[in-house]
Amino acid sequence: PPHEKPPHENTPPEYQPPHEKPPHEHPPPEYQPPHEKPPHEKPSPKYQPPHEHSPPEYQPPHEKPPHENPPPVYKPPYENSPPPHVYHRPLFQAPPPVKPSRPFGPFPAFKN
């Protein structure tokens, strides 16, 4: 009696149910939705923004540079002041005494 049951009732019922579902209901629904959206709604809007940004970005930098350059001419009064003139002299006199020691200047003297 134990020889006619195990080899007969164990194989057929376990091999039929998992074979008709996974390979049939999975591939079709997963391959359709992603095929009609990405290749259609992505390339279109992504190619337009970079085209409309170029023209407006080239105009603003063209009207400003030529306008902000002339104002720097107002710097003369800054050089006439005594503070900026006195500060430049002491900074330039410090390196002279180090020059005779070496022909390189302040570089080798700083290490000494």
UniProtKB/Swiss-Prot annotation:
GO terms for biological process: nodulation. Keywords: Nodulation, Repeat. Transmembrane segments: none annotated. Residues 1-112 are annotated as: Disordered. It comes from the Eukaryota. Residues 68-85, 93-106 have a biased composition (Pro residues). Residues 17-67 have a biased composition (Basic and acidic residues). Nodule parenchyma (inner cortex) of root nodules. Belongs to the nodulin 75 family. Involved in early stages of root nodule development. This is Early nodulin-75. It comes from Pisum sativum. The gene is ENOD2.
